[in-house]
Amino acid sequence: MLSLGVNIDHVATLRQARRTVEPDPVAAAVIAELAGADGITVHLREDRRHIQERDVRLLRQTVRTHLNLEMAATDEMVAIALEIKPDYVTLVPERREEVTTEGGLDVAGQVSRLSEVVSQLQGSGIPVSLFVDPDPIQIAAAAQVGARWVELHTGRYAEASSEAQQEAELAQLRQASQQAIQLGLRVNAGHGLTYWNVGPVARIPGMEELNIGHSIISRAVLVGLERAVREMRQAMGLSSGVGPA
């Protein structure tokens, strides 16, 4: 069944803009869960530009759905994950100069390293997802290194400048999902998804979870986080949530 993972990185972005203590990502996670989020996603970047290690530790103690830790495949991040033990890890590419993650992980180009990292994490009971472009070579490599999931990068779909281009990108996502499932992988997706473009991705056969952050947090500034999460669930074709209206 399709689920919604709410990425709360940009709650921390707002906090870090003033180097203060609020808004608190941990409090945001509680509100998101009460509004119907099926999981909480955070990206602990090497430069600590938004989410801090302390946030991840507190979230591990407080999240009642599941905690998805996005991170680079570095020794430092692997050590943190092995200590904190999130419900699962999503390995993502990372460059210090980027504003946000700009593309999928090159799994095919680093099979040996990623096999080692996946083995370390999953050997300690932490399932691993790989954030990849909807590319047959990368999906095959994800299966080769032993990952449990792929998270399909929906950026090109989200940024398509015409209806024809968007439909072509959507077709690639559908094909990638089908290939992943045939290889025994589970399928999530995310990046650039909004209230206006999420519907077709939500309807891709086999899709398990959509991880969405910026659009929800942007909407929350105007209408509040609880309503923003409920509205995203509705846009995905899910029930509006579990708490009071």
Swiss-Prot record:
It is found in: Cytoplasm. It comes from the Bacteria. Pathway: Cofactor biosynthesis; pyridoxine 5'-phosphate biosynthesis; pyridoxine 5'-phosphate from D-erythrose 4-phosphate: step 5/5. 1-deoxy-D-xylulose 5-phosphate binds at D9, H10, R45, H50, T100. The record marks E151 as: Transition state stabilizer. GO terms for cellular component: cytosol. Keywords: Cytoplasm, Pyridoxine biosynthesis, Transferase. Its EC number is 2.6.99.2. GO terms for molecular function: pyridoxine 5'-phosphate synthase activity. It is an enzyme of class 2 (transferase). GO terms for biological process: pyridoxine biosynthetic process. 3-amino-2-oxopropyl phosphate binds at N7, R18, G192, G213, H214. The active site is at H43 (proton acceptor), E70 (proton acceptor), H191 (proton donor). It catalyses: 3-amino-2-oxopropyl phosphate + 1-deoxy-D-xylulose 5-phosphate = pyridoxine 5'-phosphate + phosphate + 2 H2O + H(+). PANTHER family: PYRIDOXINE 5'-PHOSPHATE SYNTHASE. Homooctamer; tetramer of dimers. Catalyzes the complicated ring closure reaction between the two acyclic compounds 1-deoxy-D-xylulose-5-phosphate (DXP) and 3-amino-2-oxopropyl phosphate (1-amino-acetone-3-phosphate or AAP) to form pyridoxine 5'-phosphate (PNP) and inorganic phosphate. Belongs to the PNP synthase family. This is Pyridoxine 5'-phosphate synthase. It comes from Synechococcus sp. (strain JA-3-3Ab).
